[in-house]
């Protein structure tokens, strides 16, 4: 569901799923209609840097962070196989930071500088499109020299904030700095250098003679 929704539901003949949000508390209701209920696993995007508590059917439960998560931290919560399951998550701490809220426009061989927000840190870089000629990571800034063809590109930085870890995408646009070919404007033609050319002979000739 979209991140800004505070309630939603979906239902099929076999299962119903309902979600509600009130301030820092998210509640998920799962109803199964199988003869033998399955063990549901809830995977959700984190929306804050810490979790105050997780409960499954009012019983404290554990959660796991999925290491390969990208875009947002992804959490996994497993429940017992019952016909009705209620999972409650209480969040706390600061909202998750974004390194680049907008897509920077950079020339090839240009430089990219990103400020790392207070409370966050980065430890790794994954560059599948090879757009980073070189880069440095510090406690407060990420700097890189950009290379590559014009267009939209993405690389990823492994971000840590509070209890959350995830691969955060950084989108950049490499602008086209190549000069367009020059053309002579018709107004620049010098009439005294022009001469008449008779095409009648060619236009009226046989196709094999042209």
Annotate the PLM regions.
Residues 1-135:
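Non-catalytic C-terminal accessory modules of carbohydrate-active enzymes
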Residues 32, 44, 110-118, 124, ...:
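Aromatic/hydrophobic beta-strand junction motif of beta-rich domains
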Residues 79-83, 145-152:
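Surface-exposed, short loops/turns at beta-strand junctions within beta-sandwich domains
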Residues 85-91, 150-170:
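Short, aromatic- and glycine-rich surface loops/edge beta-strands on solvent-exposed regions
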Residues 95-117, 168-195:
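Low-complexity, Pro/Ser/Thr- and charge-rich linker/hinge segments at domain boundaries
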Residues 125-129, 143-144, 153-157:
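Long, low-complexity acidic/proline-rich regions
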Residues 129-148, 204-207:
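Immunoglobulin-like IPT/TIG beta-sandwich domains and homologous Ig-like subdomains
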Residues 140, 154-158, 174, 180-210:
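Alpha-helical solenoid repeat scaffolds
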């Amino acid at each position: 569901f979209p991140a800004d929704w505070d309630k939603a539901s979906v239902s099929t003949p076999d299962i119903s799923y309902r979600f509600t949000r009130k301030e820092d508390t998210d509640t998920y209701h799962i109803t199964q209609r199988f003869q033998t209920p399955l063990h549901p696993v809830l995977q959700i995007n984190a929306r804050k840097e810490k979790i105050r508590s997780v409960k499954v059917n009012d019983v404290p439960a554990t959660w796991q962070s999925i290491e390969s998560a990208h875009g947002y931290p992804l959490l996994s919560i497993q429940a017992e196989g019952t016909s009705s399951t209620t999972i409650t998550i209480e969040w706390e701490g600061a909202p998750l930071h974004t390194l680049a809220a907008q897509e920077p426009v950079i020339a090839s061989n240009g430089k990219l500088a990103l400020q790392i927000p207070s409370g966050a840190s980065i430890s790794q870089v994954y560059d599948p499109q090879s757009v980073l000629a070189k880069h440095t990571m510090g406690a407060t800034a990420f700097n890189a020299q950009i290379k590559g063809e014009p267009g939209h590109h993405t690389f990823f930085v492994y971000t840590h904030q509070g209890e959350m870890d995830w691969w955060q995408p950084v989108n950049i646009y490499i602008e086209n700095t190549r000069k367009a070919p020059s053309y002579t404007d018709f107004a620049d033609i010098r009439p005294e250098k022009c001469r008449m050319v008779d095409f009648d002979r060619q236009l009226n000739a046989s196709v094999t003679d042209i």
